[in-house]
């Protein structure tokens, strides 16, 4: 399944506009906020451009976790039973690029990351959490747009083995 990801070009424009406005009003604070924002799960990226660059360099698909890290019970359970386990971390390092797309209620997320996450949520039609999509990205540099080659999606699974087996089936298709 291939999705044309035209909203990313809007996101990239919005990102540069937000950075410019924030930099003008807050000095370098905008860059500091962005630099200090990290994923809830160690080792996960939060920026689609960084995930794309690493995916392109390694040839690995991106595995995006749409989560509500501070309020979603099933998201917390998935983190505890799968993402926090050494077995998963070892598997992920060999097989995927990890991208966390968080929709917290009590944690402050920079505006550019909020916009990125909302655009990706719309592009993948995510309506519940946790939702994990596995995909490849291609970028048209001239148009500054991504094309998504979706490999599959999953939600909560109780064990590392069950989770990784499911994702491996998506990757092999």
Predicted regions and their residues:
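N-terminal "domain-start" segment that seeds a small globular fold
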Residues: 24-52
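The canonical Cys-X-X-Cys-His
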Residues: 72-76, 132
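Thiol-based oxidoreductase modules, predominantly thioredoxin-like and allied folds used
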Residues: 42-45, 88-115
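A short beta-strand-turn-helix
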Residues: 44-62, 92
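Short active-site neighborhood of thiol/selenol oxidoreductases, capturing the structured segment around
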Residues: 58-72
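Typically the conserved alpha-helix immediately C-terminal to a functionally engaged Cys/Sec
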Residues: 75-91
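Non-catalytic, surface beta->alpha helical segment in thiol-disulfide oxidoreductase systems
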Residues: 122-173
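C-terminal segment of classical bacterial N-terminal signal peptides
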Residues: 12-20
């Amino acid at each position: 399944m291939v999705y044309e990801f035209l909203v990313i070009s809007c996101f990239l424009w919005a990102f540069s506009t937000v950075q410019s406005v924030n930099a003008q009003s807050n000095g370098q604070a905008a860059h500091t906020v962005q630099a200090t924002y990290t994923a809830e799960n160690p080792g996960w990226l939060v920026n689609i451009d960084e995930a794309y660059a690493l995916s392109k360099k390694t040839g690995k698909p991106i595995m995006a976790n749409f989560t509500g890290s501070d309020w979603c019970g099933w998201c917390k359970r998935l983190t505890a039973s799968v993402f926090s386990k050494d077995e998963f971390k070892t598997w992920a390092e060999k097989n995927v690029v990890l991208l966390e797309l968080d929709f917290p209620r009590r944690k402050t997320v920079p505006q550019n990351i909020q916009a990125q996450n909302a655009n990706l949520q719309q592009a993948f039609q995510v309506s519940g959490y946790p939702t994990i999509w596995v995909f490849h990205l291609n970028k048209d540099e001239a148009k500054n747009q991504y094309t998504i080659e979706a490999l599959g999606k999953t939600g909560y699974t109780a064990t590392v083995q069950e989770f990784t087996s499911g994702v491996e089936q998506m990757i092999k298709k």
